Amino acid sequence: MEPIRILQVVPNMNSGGLENLIMNIYRNIDRSKVQFDFLVHYQKKGFFDDEIVKLGGKIYRFSVREDNNVIKYIKELNEFFKEHPEYKVVHGHMASLGFIYFNIAKKHKVPVRIAHSHGTSHLKTLKGYMKFLTLKLE
């Protein structure tokens, strides 16, 4: 039986806190049952890219964080999910673009969409807290 493939949506896979957390999990899961693939938002190779490939993961590169072309990003995401119906789980770690990639994943019938916040700085303002509450209600 093929492993379940979980698409991790991240800025890049350099050696920051978020990336180390994901890699610690990835190294210790049963990869015959669950595999992580990565949708990154920079073209430049990341610190963990070689290890990801060695562990059986795939890396898909988008450039929206470099070219700031949101229209192109939306088109690329639609094409991506059309070409990759194997993803039944999208685990997003990017609040800034989450409203785009989660809505497109939903449109393409990805049944499980996990929003993971790695910080609480957005809770320091009333606007940020209201946004947080709104996301919790959806």
What feature does the model see in each segment?
Residues M1-E138:
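Membrane-interface segments of envelope glycosyltransferases acting on lipid-linked substrates or membrane lipids
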